[in-house]
Amino acid sequence: MPRAPPSGPTTAPGREDDARGLRKRSRRPGLGEAGGCGPEAEGLEESRQKRRMVARASGREEVESDKSAKEKRKVTEASSDDPQPGIDLVRKESLTSSESFPTVECSEFQSMAFLQSLGKERLVEGIKRRIRIKKCKSLESPALKMTENKATQNSKVEFQDELYKNTLKYSCNSLSPGVENNSVLKLHDCSCLSHSKDCNDENNLAYKPDGGCMHVPENSSKSKKENPRSLIDKTDPSNIPQLLQTEENVMRVSQLLLEENDSYLSKNNGLFSCLQSEKTKHSIEESSIGRKSRKRMKVSEKGNGMVIEMKFSNMCNKSELMLQGNQTGADGKETEILEAKKSSLKVLRKVNNNTLSPMDPLLSLPETGKKTSPEHCANAVFQKALEQLSKEETKNVSQPLGCTSMDPPEDYFKSMKNSLVKSLSDCFPIEKRSSRESLKNEAEESKYSCQRTIPMTGKRTWPCYSCARISAQCWKKASLPQSSRQDDFLKHQMNQTHLTDSKLMLQSSVTETNSASSSIEKLDSNLNCLPSVSTVEPTSVVIKEPIVNDDEKMKSEELSRSASEVVSNTTEDTSLTNMTHNLTGSKKKDRGNLTKLNLTVASQDGQEANNSTSKTVHRKACITKQALVVPDLVKILNTGRLTNFKIPLLKNKTEKRKEINAKSSEREVYSPLELLDSVSGAEVRQSRTKENAVTVTSGPQSLSIQRSVIPVQASSDSFCSKNSCIIAPSFLKQGNNKQPSNHISASGRIISNNAAGSLTVENNTFSCDPGCIEKNPTFYSNEQEPFKAVSSEVSGRKMTENFSEIKVGFPDILKAYEDDVLLIDVIQDDPDLFGVSNEGELSFPSEVPMISQEPNVAEEHQSTDSKHMELPDKKEPSNALRELPVPDPGSMKSEICASLSAASEIKHDSKDANISLGEVTHETSSNEKPRGLSEQTKSSDLDEKCRFSDKVAIREEKETISEVCRRDSKNTEIMVGECHLAALVSKPLCLPVPLPPLNLNAHQEDTLLNPQMNDFRLPGKHSVLKLQNPEICEIFKREKNVGVFQKPLGLMIPHRYCKFHFNTLRGCERSQCKFGHVPEQGDEKVCMDVFKKYISINELCLLQRAANMFMEYYRKFLPGIHFDLQVLNDLLSSLLKHCLLKEVFQVMNLCIMIKMLPALKILLKIFEYVATMKLRNAVPALINIFCKLLEAGMVLDPEHFNYIVKLLYQVQASKQEITAVLEMKSRLHMRQFKKNWKCDLEAALNEIEHCKEKGDWTKLGNVYLNIKMSCEKFADFQRFCACIAETLTKDCKEERPGVPFCEFAETVSKDLQNSEVDKTLLGRIGISAMYFYHKLLQWSKGRKVLDKLYELKIHFTSLKGLIGPEKLAPRCQIVNIAAEIFLKSGSLDGAIWVLRESEWIINTPVWPCDRLDVLNRHNLLCTIAHEILAKSLYRQTFEVLQNLPGFQNSQETVEVSQYSLLFNKLLDACIESNSLGMSSSVAEFMISKSIPIDFSFLRRLITSLGRSCLWLKARAHYKSALSLGCYPPLEGNLYRKLLLIPSYLSEIEMLLAIEIFLVSNASSIQSPGTSTQMLQIVLKRSEENKSRSKDDYQAAVERLITAARISDPKLFIKHMTVNVNKEQVYSLEQCSALKWLKENMKWAGKVWLFNNH
């Protein structure tokens, strides 16, 4: 693997020299004074210069890093799938080009793999060797004083500033020079990933030995394997020289730092080596102060880390954009690789990613300087440890991270520190001890550190010994062996991690290897952006390594992703968030990765701190104040991320609280680092609970995680709580060792350089708002100076002012630290802590910048760690703490207030995180639950406001908060909180009330564990936390952080009900709540009280909850005595005001079901609202509800109906809908009448008379309908109808044009429920009216009545009247009257219709009638027949004549012969009109009925029929006429062969006579013997014809001849002679006759020979 270091840019050596000079200068002032202000100033200047150089380099590197980041993402995704054993950062050094750094960002493993593919392992190994050599040298140096460290940090900070500037040029996002170690790395990062990313082979030459050498062995190989492509793509030869230069500078700086760290490592084994080295010296100087000094150092360190993170976030935003893009692809593979590599690879990967960005170079340089020698040792050990850990992690995924991975990987962690890939424990021990010592220390620290950060098995249950449950126990380092305690603590963290779920799994990183890798990549990108971030990376790497050890392989990768995501978010809280947005493509994965990585780093740092109280994180070896500042940022980051963790803190909560309380009290004796570790562990738990990714595993682990997370979480309250707890332990420890920067670098990469350059980084970080970071890498450079000042302040108390300048000042926290005050952030309204109180809202001074709170948080955590029981004492700085709570908006979402000090710190840190993490929070919140990040951002934002007067920081914080709020708003859980958060942002963030003592309710302690306690329930996303009691506490905390949300509503709720659901604005956010959310039967009064309260508050969420509660309760139970209709009306009105129309409809429908109708005004308001808003789609549902309400008994006046119809027209309702309303109007009138006139016939009769007087027949119809519905007895109703009939038939004046019956019938007929009974009654009333008008001879009115009956299809002919004679009238009479009315009114059709309707019935057994009625019918029919015949309506006339009396049945004794005239007249008319068919029918009917028929008409008919060729009918009628005597009989002439034909016959008649003659003589004609005989025809003259002229007879002759011709076949006749009577005699030719017979004999014989009658 070792490779020759690539020839770096020409500037690299110079930079190294500068770094070395910076180291020297930093050592001097650091030794001279704790603050190191003087040297810091110089360091700041130099660092600024170097930053400029780095910025220039970064500008170029950014472009490359972007490309490489994209490639890395791909490689990372591929690599993350398959976890590989640890790969050396040396392998990552194969990233000779700047693109390799982006690849590292994407994933350590990918970058490692890429490095391998590049074949640049030799360069990496060479770098490692250099770093190791430097580490050895630094280790050889006995110990550096805190002042030396601070000075070195200051110098590094200055150098980093310059590097940062240069880095900005090289990379899109360059971290501010706040991180001293990162500054050195940043030089490399300009060309490649700085030391902060071990994956950067070229850039991290110095750094890789520091942070990633040990870790690289396992991870580098894998990352190289996985990321060869991405690394190659991303590695940019242009960056190589810069990386070399940076590496050289880093090596120089790292040598100085390592020397200092070596002294500390020798003093402090494990994570505390750096911090405790500072602490030891500082504590030696302030031995009387003891823990307070440690706390101060941690606070300063946290502040520096915060600042670094802030600047990192700014720088990282750009670089991270590139890195995240790469990280996104690399996340998937990184996760698996990290799992196998125990998150050390994650760190490396992130380091590589960071190398791509300017942040990484800056970070890598300082870290390399500090941790080179220890990490060389650690690398060897770490490689082995990684292998072992990878195996152990695979086996012990469920085991506490610290237990398995912490012990062996201490050295490994040391190397991991330099590379974020290292596990948490590895990070801590890496500081300056040998690999073995570090591993041991880490094992011990892991026992005491919060196990949450440790790899998560994915289980929700945490062992009772987990940090979440026994953070106090974790703190007891003295009581337990450090290794064992660390193991236990890691176990707890592991448990917590399991509780934390996927995000805690980030710490465990086994399950979430991908996310961890992404996190690391993001972290790396953050590191690239922020110099301090690189420092954080090593720490986070160390933290992640333990995570990888257990379940962490999978989860460590996840943690890496989350941690790096957190780091990016944290560092970029202001800047990183922007970076994250820039890295939109890989933003989500990167965010998750960063968060997880940060979490892992934080937890690792916490573990490291626990393992070796004396140990200080290598990268945290920076100034104590810087480390403290960074811890705040880390807290903020962690807080935001912790929200993602879901830890059931309720389990064994009471016992654990007690233990934590007792331990916290006992831990006053313990080092502040332990306390911080414990607190961080608790906070990490909460963070996990809320932010799986954010919360690392344990207090110590979360500490390191916080480093990486700090930049991200700095913008959220959750960061304060989480980081406060996480950072507190490691920073207290680191504060002594002045290595909190490492821790911060792990979490945010700002912290990593906290020791030497964390302040600078923090300044940059703080100066970089989320927007700034994202938007402006130069902003980092601008803020690098403030960071430098901050770093100097951290070393010399100027941090606060510088942070103010940076907009992230930490005045209160620094003061508190200086004053040895423990700042505690507590929610005054937290019922778990203080019971339900009305102090939920906290005033937040907008003056304090967000970042300033982070340093305070760091100080608070340090003080908390140093003095577990001093948390109450440090309530004096509670303003800062409250400022931290001020991020309550963030806290609400992230539940940052899990621990008191953590809560306060979280709030302050949240503000800080808001500045640096604002944008990071967006990333984190998008990857995690937006609520947590937003909470982090808000809390950090609020804290900054409280802490710093810098308004710019506040603005940035607000921007961050607004961004976070927007993200959160996307999440329903955070929606309400976001609004309040925005409000809080606008408000000043100041918590005037001192925080109550940490000793609170067990539940409260679990949630808000004292900063001493490691319980991280404060982490950002309380909504994510599904904790039982802790979750409730977190909810209250969040609500309090948000102000109104956390404030109880003041309801007195029975204990069996969930007070959060009923008594808070946010409601219960637990997935499964054991308390009731719906009142039980008998608690209707509770319902009403809740409704009243919610209505009075008039909040949208509460009104929705009230509506749902109403629906759920009254679906089960009926309204009782406590039901208040006014409350229902108020609820509906409030819902309508908030445009909750759906809920309004639901409640209305349920009200109808339970028969509790709302007020009419509510219904009208709903119609008005729908009409005003033009909600056409809502009209059908509204009409449905309207109809149901009316049917249920609601009464509306006619004007109300008219108004509703008007509104419906406005909304363009359909005709059907409007008709439905009108129908309901009529039905309502009926109901009203029914209600007023129930069976009250007397009143009804009076009403009838009243209607009669007024002539209001429509109203009479309504009266009828109402009576019909109300009457129970039909007889009574008939009486009433008789009264109506009388009214309609009496006293009617002719002058009135209208017919009362018609109006009345029209009204009644409109009733939809009209039945046959109604029709019958109307028909009977109509008959009475008809009789009435018939008597009055008012034919027109009578006809109107008949027309109405016809229109209504009422068959009145079968009915009888209701009153008078018509009541007994026969049917014939009724029909006669009706027909007569029609006839008199001129309607023959009407008359015929009536007759037909009655079936012409006159007198039948069923319908008997009088003779007078029959006579009347005869006369009526005759009259009708004459009128119809006059109109030539022969068929109708014949129909009428056929139905004359006497024709229907035999009972009628009428003589039909009297109808002869009528029929003959009809027959004549038909013949005249040539209606042969009708004529034939009439003739047949007359013949059949024996009606005398006129022969002339009959003969005419026969002739007409024949001429019309209707021979059949002609022959039939001729035969009938012959039988009737119309023709003379043939007598006997037939057989004499003589035919006598009268001359008056027509030719048709003559032919018919000839046919009969032929048929009669057929036998003789056809016989052969008779051929001699002749057939003679005599045209006989009649006597009448005698007197006539000859012409008539001659015409008869012609007719005869014609008759013979028309025959078929023709007949031939010959004139023979004239007889005596002068009659012509003709002979019929035999042949023609024979022929005719042959053809016609068949039918002719039938017709003529047989009688058909």
From Swiss-Prot:
Pfam families documented for this protein: Asp_Glu_race_2
Keyword tags: Cytoplasm, Differentiation, Spermatogenesis
Coarse class of the protein's main subcellular location: cytoplasm
Chain residue ranges for the region called Disordered: 1-88, 212-238, 553-591, 855-893, 919-942
Compositionally biased region (Polar residues): 561-585
GO annotations of cellular component type: cytosol
Compositional bias ranges of the Basic and acidic residues kind: 58-69, 221-236, 858-877, 920-942
Name listed for the protein in its UniProt record: Protein TOPAZ1
Taxonomic source organism: Bos taurus
Lineage: Eukaryota, Metazoa, Chordata, Craniata, Vertebrata
